[in-house]
């Protein structure tokens, strides 16, 4: 059975056909609409899936935000242009006439990355560092989503009580500091207004402020990982996302994690499926996992 998998992120929308063998075909991308209206997202999703839906038997969505009862509830609305609520499952069922499931994108990615690991590993945490910071937890070989879908939203744990206000309403969240949006928001002077990609480029060219911003992000993530180890005693942490997979970033995180007491050390791995982990995880869950 072929699954039409969709990944909804703060920067881009992706879709692909994924067979029972896990092979990705006909991958497509569109930018996430900047508009705050549900109609803009519906129109973008329609354009994304219309060339693919005739070749699929079901739809599986991995989306940023809390997924509850098939709807997207934005914990940080800034990541989706201010969109607070969107009926994901209902919308895709109307667009495709196919049975549809939905799950948080980082939770989906955690499940895909877990499947790629050795069989003796039962406990992992996946962290995506991209437009925002998200996570997914696999404990005892089971994906933990929580009764309200909030499990794994580790980007909204406290990093600095005197830090910037996060879009979720809290102050000093990991996401407000370590994410691509957080890196860009802290830029000043010549870098003011630059996005995270530009800041990484400037860091590679030796720009001191750009390097400091990236170190700040990596240090914040390392402290989060130490907290995660203390909370879950996971066997490894897998890091993905456009920032998490940027050249040299994971090595920086490892350097800062090594400065923590040894009890809080844990193996760090780059995401095996790179930017396709959410798509694959959603498809895998559609094949047999009850959500």
UniProtKB/Swiss-Prot annotation:
Pfam families for the chain: ROK
Annotated gene: nanK
Cited function: Catalyzes the phosphorylation of N-acetylmannosamine (ManNAc) to ManNAc-6-P.
UniProt-recorded name of the protein: N-acetylmannosamine kinase
Record text on subunit structure and interactions: Homodimer.
Organism: Escherichia coli O127:H6 (strain E2348/69 / EPEC)
PROSITE patterns to which the protein is assigned, alphabetical: ROK
EC number: 2.7.1.60
Family (UniProt): Belongs to the ROK (NagC/XylR) family. NanK subfamily.
Lineage: Bacteria, Pseudomonadati, Pseudomonadota, Gammaproteobacteria, Enterobacterales
Known pathway: Amino-sugar metabolism; N-acetylneuraminate degradation; D-fructose 6-phosphate from N-acetylneuraminate: step 2/5
Keyword hit for GTP-binding: no
A Gene Ontology molecular function term of the record: zinc ion binding
Alphabetic keyword roster: ATP-binding, Carbohydrate metabolism, Kinase, Metal-binding, Nucleotide-binding, Transferase, Zinc
Recorded catalytic activity of this chain's protein: an N-acyl-D-mannosamine + ATP = an N-acyl-D-mannosamine 6-phosphate + ADP + H(+)
């Amino acid at each position: 059975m072929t699954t039409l998998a969709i990944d909804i992120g703060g920067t881009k929308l992706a879709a692909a056909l994924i067979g029972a063998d896990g092979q990705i075909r006909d991958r497509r991308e569109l930018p996430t609409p900047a508009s705050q209206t549900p109609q803009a997202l519906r129109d973008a999703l329609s354009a994304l899936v219309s060339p693919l839906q005739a070749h699929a038997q079901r739809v599986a969505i991995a989306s940023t935000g809390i997924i509850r009862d098939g709807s997207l509830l934005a914990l940080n609305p800034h990541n989706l242009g201010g969109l607070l609520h969107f009926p994901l499952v209902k919308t895709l069922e109307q667009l495709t006439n196919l049975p549809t499931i939905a799950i948080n994108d980082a939770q989906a990615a955690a499940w895909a990355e877990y499947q790629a690991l050795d069989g003796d590993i039962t406990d992992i945490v996946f962290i995506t560092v991209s437009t925002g910071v998200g996570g997914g937890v696999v404990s005892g070989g089971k994906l933990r989503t929580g009764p309200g879908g909030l499990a794994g939203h580790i980007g909204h744990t406290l990093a600095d009580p005197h830090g910037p206000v996060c879009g979720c309403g809290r102050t000093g969240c990991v996401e407000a500091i370590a994410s691509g949006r957080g890196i860009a928001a802290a830029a000043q002077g010549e870098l003011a207004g630059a996005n995270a990609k530009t800041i990484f480029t400037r860091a590679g060219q030796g720009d001191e402020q750009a390097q400091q911003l990236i170190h700040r992000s990596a240090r914040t993530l390392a402290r989060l990982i130490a907290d995660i180890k203390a909370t879950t005693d996971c066997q490894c942490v897998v890091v993905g996302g456009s920032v998490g997979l940027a050249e040299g970033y994971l090595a920086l995180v490892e350097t800062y994690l090594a400065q923590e007491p040894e009890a809080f050390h844990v193996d760090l791995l780059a995401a095996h499926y790179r930017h396709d982990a959410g798509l694959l995880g959603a498809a895998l869950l559609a094949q047999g996992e009850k959500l």
